[in-house]
């Protein structure tokens, strides 16, 4: 599948058109952001980790009967996906309160949000 022009770019990934209108290449970048995207730096391997984690989650959902957009992993940082209307949802997992959630919920920065587990 040939990757063509850039369709859209977010904080962590880019979507590219392909020769098939129903499919896109999702490219996970090594970009990291802080301060609501105002500070961008590169972290080598981040795109690979995010691509593999995304594929793990999507394959798990699919195994439980939840259809998803993932078609195949193309390489370390790219996957072939179906072109769909996005359902905007974000999940950030931390073991402590940080970032914009502290402002929204009035939480103390650094407050433990769950007990440690081994």
Predicted region positions:
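Active-site loop/lid in soluble adenylation, ligation, and acyl-transfer enzymes
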Residues: 2-115
